[in-house]
């Protein structure tokens, strides 16, 4: 038996997934760490938190699995995107990692937009947002010049783990694509962007494919965990790219709907596509491919907010128990899930959520259904942009996250998206994609398609659109789409009013 290990470096925890060479799950281990918020809007972590967590996971695996050390062949990673790690000439961190959800960089985003204009979108296929890496670099240059003077290498979080394991510094294209420094099409660091902001390209890591080897586990670490083989380490991928691989997003026929705190719609892209900044566009873990991604900022978050505000004391099952006695369209009640602003397709941080069409006959069950429908309508915005731009409709959509556990929500998705919906037998998230990269890299399979066939499995039952419901949803969705343009100015005025208070 041969084992491969996928390490998923998340925002609040690190998870290790151990699988065998035919795709059977052996076990999982995880370790949590803190997020530091020294000031409002700041979100940081010390890279050593991640190392402590990785050590804990490796220890747990070596204790639980008796032949872990003898059978482990390869390790790969998935990791939180965009977060900035800066090292000195001894490869030691000189500043806490500034995380993807840190929002201190609004000024720097405007500087990037003003200086590069349309060229930023042409080169990186993305617009400047606080989450990306380049604004964090500029903030460090401007606000911590002494720290910046000591920076000899810039890294991304998962690559710091690879450095610790192997002693080598690399990154791969799916994570580099989230920095705003990568020329997506040429697959190289952009001279135009680095020159514009006085960034020495020598401090950027060497670029390789997700499936390329970064090295071998160092002897002292191998000895500590009794690894008897020369364990290979592979570059891995950004969390969303690894998650896409881990659900089988390796061709254009399927799309991915993921509903967690935020909602994500992803599509495989065999070549460069021009979404004109309406969607995120990144290199994939599949060599030579890309993926597009639309984001609903508050998907599950809207449902959680609704429950805590209007259903306190109720379980989710109780809150939603009567939703399916209400007809599609919630009898004329609409909800927009813009409670923290919105990403796709509006990129509007000052838009706010709303219930529209409240009537005297509406009960809690109508509001509950309207929330679910509003979240799904927002996800449909992204799906429709993808299909219209590609002029190609998805044959099936894979649903993961909280919504995939509820058959009624799955049917609602099928009806609103007008697409067959399928589910995984077991969800393991980005870490599964990392395992798949390690399995391919170790030569256990001759293609990522073969790995996918062995590692990714779907439930037999799917959810088929109901034509009557599809027609009703098409009608109400066209009305729902008008809410943004008719409430955005009011929302902006309300945000300004609240800020003044």
Swiss-Prot record:
List of catalytic residues: 239
Cysteine-cysteine disulfides: none
Pfam family, one: FGGY_N
Site-annotated residues for Important for activity: 8
Keyword set, alphabetical order: ATP-binding, Carbohydrate metabolism, Kinase, Nucleotide-binding, Transferase, Xylose metabolism
CDD domains for this protein: ASKHA_NBD_FGGY_EcXK-like (cd07808)
Binding residues annotated for substrate, in chain numbering: 81-82
Top enzyme category: transferase
Any single biological process term in GO: D-xylose metabolic process
Gene Ontology terms for molecular function: ATP binding; D-xylulokinase activity
Catalytic activity field: D-xylulose + ATP = D-xylulose 5-phosphate + ADP + H(+)
UniProt-listed Enzyme Commission number(s): 2.7.1.17
Keyword Transferase included in the entry's annotation: yes
PANTHER family according to UniProt: SUGAR KINASE, XYLULOSE KINASE
Function according to Swiss-Prot or TrEMBL: Catalyzes the phosphorylation of D-xylulose to D-xylulose 5-phosphate.
UniProt record similarity statement: Belongs to the FGGY kinase family.
Protein name, UniProt field: Xylulose kinase
Organism: Lactococcus lactis subsp. lactis (strain IL1403)
Gene coding for it: xylB
């Amino acid at each position: 038996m041969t084992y491969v290990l996928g390490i998923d470096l998340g925002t609040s925890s690190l998870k290790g997934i151990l699988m065998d060479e035919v795709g059977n799950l052996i076990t999982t281990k995880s370790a949590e760490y803190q997020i530091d918020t020294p000031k409002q809007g700041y979100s940081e972590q010390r890279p050593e938190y991640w190392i402590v967590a990785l050590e804990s996971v490796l220890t747990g695996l070596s204790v639980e699995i008796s032949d872990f050390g003898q059978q482990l062949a390869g390790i790969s990673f998935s990791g939180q995107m965009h977060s900035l790690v800066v090292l000195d000439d001894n490869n030691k961190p000189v500043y806490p990692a500034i995380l993807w959800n840190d929002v201190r960089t609004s000024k720097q985003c405007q500087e990037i937009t003003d200086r590069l204009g349309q060229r930023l979108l042409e080169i990186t296929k993305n617009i400047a947002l606080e989450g990306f890496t380049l604004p964090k670099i500029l903030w460090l240059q401007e606000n911590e010049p002494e720290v910046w003077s000591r920076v000899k290498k810039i890294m991304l979080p998962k690559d710091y783990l690879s450095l610790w394991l192997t002693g080598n510094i690399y990154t791969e294209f799916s994570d580099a694509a989230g920095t705003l420094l990568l020329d997506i099409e040429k697959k190289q660091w952009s001279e135009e962007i680095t020159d514009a902001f006085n960034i020495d390209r020598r401090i950027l890591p060497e670029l390789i494919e997700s499936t390329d080897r970064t090295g071998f586990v160092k002897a002292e670490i191998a000895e500590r965990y009794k690894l008897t083989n020369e364990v290979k380490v592979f570059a891995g991928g950004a969390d969303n790219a690894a998650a896409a691989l881990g659900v089988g997003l390796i061709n254009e026929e399927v799309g991915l709907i993921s509903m967690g705190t935020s909602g994500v719609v992803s599509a495989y892209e065999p070549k460069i596509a021009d979404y004109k900044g309406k969607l995120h566009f990144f290199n994939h873990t599949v060599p030579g491919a890309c993926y597009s991604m639309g984001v609903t900022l508050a998907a599950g978050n809207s449902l959680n907010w609704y429950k805590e505000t209007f259903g306190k004391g109720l379980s989710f099952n109780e809150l939603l128990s009567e939703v399916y006695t209400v007809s599609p369209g919630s009898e004329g009640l609409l909800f927009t899930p813009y409670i923290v602003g919105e990403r796709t397709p509006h990129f509007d941080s000052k838009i706010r959520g709303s219930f529209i069409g409240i009537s005297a006959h509406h009960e809690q069950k109508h509001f509950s259904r309207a929330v679910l429908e509003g979240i799904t309508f927002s996800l449909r915005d992204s799906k429709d942009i993808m299909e219209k731009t590609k002029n190609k409709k998805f044959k099936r959509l894979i649903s993961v996250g909280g919504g995939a556990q509820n058959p009624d929500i799955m049917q609602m998705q099928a009806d609103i998206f007008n697409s067959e919906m399928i589910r995984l037998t077991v969800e393991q998230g980005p870490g599964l994609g990392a395992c798949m990269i390690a399995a391919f890299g170790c030569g256990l399979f001759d293609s990522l398609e073969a790995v996918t066939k062995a590692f990714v499995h779907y439930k037999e039952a799917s959810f088929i659109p109901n034509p009557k419901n599809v027609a009703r949803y098409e009608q109400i969705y066209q009305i729902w789409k008008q809410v943004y343009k008719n409430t955005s100015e009011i929302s902006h005025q309300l945000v300004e009013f609240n800020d003044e208070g």
